[in-house]
């Protein structure tokens, strides 16, 4: 058995990635989220496959088919709610995973970090298209508002929007293509995950100290397989509590009304995991400016390795940078709250201040404070 594990071409890859992989001896529970994201992706693909067996991508029957899944299909309700709340868990793990990368300086592994950013964009695109599929009011108007943002692109904007719609409004053609993309993208994500891991295993994992751990490595199995299993059990527990006790907690009641192009909901808002970006978009009165701010709010992650001015990789021993990191976390929570509020006083002002603070913290304050810390440590 030992020989098969180490010599068989396929088993050898598995062995070197998950069993005999040399891992730092001191990585904390914050390093669990990579495997949890893998578990979330597997859950989404499996539940999504079963939903696709009963779903019809047609404007006249899409809403009814989702109701049919919940009412008539055996355990359809639990599959549907696992899929919907699984997306929330996916993004929760994703945000923590990125936050850990920022805090401990994992972004210095630039290839892994950049593939991660591409993964983030792909997951966001997949989630957006998935939200359109039940064809409720918020699905329809969310699709209309977000796709319409592309019309802000000079010269080609309008043509681009109509090309994506497949007509002059969000209609049957849009729903069909969104379903096709929503089905294929998770498999592209899975392929990108393998590339993400490939680059990670070229350098090895970072650790809380941010120093080389070559001198002290332990095998991934059994130490981190057991540790990851604990995280997985807690994630399953949290997901099941959400699915079985309050499955609609994170959803929008408007999505239980079938899509009606003649009736606009009073407050159009996306799912909670997009609210921070939506708040940044809304905080700029100009359409093109808002779209650019929206894109840059996520693309800013790509320039973080360039903005890293500290001599230490991790924030573990940098209290001033820690203060700014947690200020950024609080700022993102404020933006998330603002994104779900109506566009009126005082929410407009709070959103604008929070948006300015978001960019100021990342682009100016964090690099400056890192330089100050270097001076204080006489480095």
UniProtKB/Swiss-Prot annotation:
Membrane topology qualifier: Multi-pass membrane protein
Bilayer-spanning residue ranges: 33-53, 77-98, 113-133, 178-198, 226-246, 288-308, 320-340, 347-367
Amino acids binding heme b b562: 83, 182
GO biological process: mitochondrial electron transport, ubiquinol to cytochrome c
Coiled-coil segments on the chain, per record: none
Cofactor binding summary note: Binds 2 heme b groups non-covalently.
Cofactor list: heme b
InterPro entries documented for this protein: Cyt_b/b6_C, Cyt_b/b6_C_sf, Cyt_b/b6_N, Cytb/b6-like_sf, Cytochrome_b, Cytochrome_b_C_euk/bac, Cytochrome_b_N_euk/bac, Di-haem_cyt_TM
Function: Component of the ubiquinol-cytochrome c reductase complex (complex III or cytochrome b-c1 complex) that is part of the mitochondrial respiratory chain. The b-c1 complex mediates electron transfer from ubiquinol to cytochrome c. Contributes to the generation of a proton gradient across the mitochondrial membrane that is then used for ATP synthesis.
Subunit structure, as described in the record: The cytochrome bc1 complex contains 11 subunits: 3 respiratory subunits (MT-CYB, CYC1 and UQCRFS1), 2 core proteins (UQCRC1 and UQCRC2) and 6 low-molecular weight proteins (UQCRH/QCR6, UQCRB/QCR7, UQCRQ/QCR8, UQCR10/QCR9, UQCR11/QCR10 and a cleavage product of UQCRFS1). This cytochrome bc1 complex then forms a dimer.
Note: Heme 1 (or BL or b562) is low-potential and absorbs at about 562 nm, and heme 2 (or BH or b566) is high-potential and absorbs at about 566 nm.
Family according to the record: Belongs to the cytochrome b family.
Designated name of the protein: Cytochrome b
């Amino acid at each position: 058995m030992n020989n098969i594990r180490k010599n068989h071409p396929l088993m050898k890859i598995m062995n070197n990635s998950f069993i005999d992989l040399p891992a730092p001896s001191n990585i904390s529970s914050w390093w669990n989220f990579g495997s949890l994201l893998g578990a979330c992706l597997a859950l989404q693909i499996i539940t999504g496959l079963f939903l696709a067996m009963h779903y019809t991508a047609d404007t006249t029957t899409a809403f009814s088919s989702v109701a049919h899944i919940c009412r008539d299909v055996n355990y359809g309700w639990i599959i549907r709610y696992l899929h919907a709340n699984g997306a929330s868990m996916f993004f929760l793990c994703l945000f923590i995973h990125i936050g850990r990368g920022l805090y401990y300086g994992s972004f210095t592994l630039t290839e892994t970090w950049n593939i991660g950013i591409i993964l983030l964009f792909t997951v966001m695109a997949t989630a957006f298209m998935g939200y359109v599929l039940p064809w409720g009011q918020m699905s329809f108007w969310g699709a209309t508002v977000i796709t319409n943002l592309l019309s802000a692109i000079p010269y080609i904007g309008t043509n681009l929007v109509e090309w994506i719609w497949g007509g002059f409004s969000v209609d049957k053609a849009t729903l069909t293509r969104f379903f096709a993309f929503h089905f294929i993208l998770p498999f592209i994500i899975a392929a990108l995950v393998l590339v993400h891991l490939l680059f990670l295993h070229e350098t090895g994992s970072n650790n809380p100290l941010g120093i080389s751990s070559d001198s002290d490595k332990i095998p991934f199995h059994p130490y981190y397989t057991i540790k990851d299993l604990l995280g997985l059990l807690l994630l399953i527990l949290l997901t099941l509590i959400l699915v079985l006790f309050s499955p609609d907690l994170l959803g929008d009641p408007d999505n239980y009304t079938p899509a009606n192009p003649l009736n606009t909901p009073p407050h159009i808002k996306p799912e909670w995991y997009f609210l921070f970006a939506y708040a940044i978009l809304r905080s700029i009165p100009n359409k093109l400016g808002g779209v650019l701010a929206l894109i840059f709010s996520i693309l800013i992650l790509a320039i973080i390795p360039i903005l890293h001015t500290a001599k230490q990789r991790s924030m573990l021993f940098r209290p001033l940078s820690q203060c700014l990191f947690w200020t950024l976390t609080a700022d993102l929570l404020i933006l998330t709250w603002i994104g779900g509020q109506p566009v009126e006083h005082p929410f407009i002002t709070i959103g604008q201040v929070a948006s300015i603070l978001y960019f100021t913290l990342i682009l100016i304050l964090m690099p400056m404070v890192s330089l100050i810390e270097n001076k204080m440590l006489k480095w």
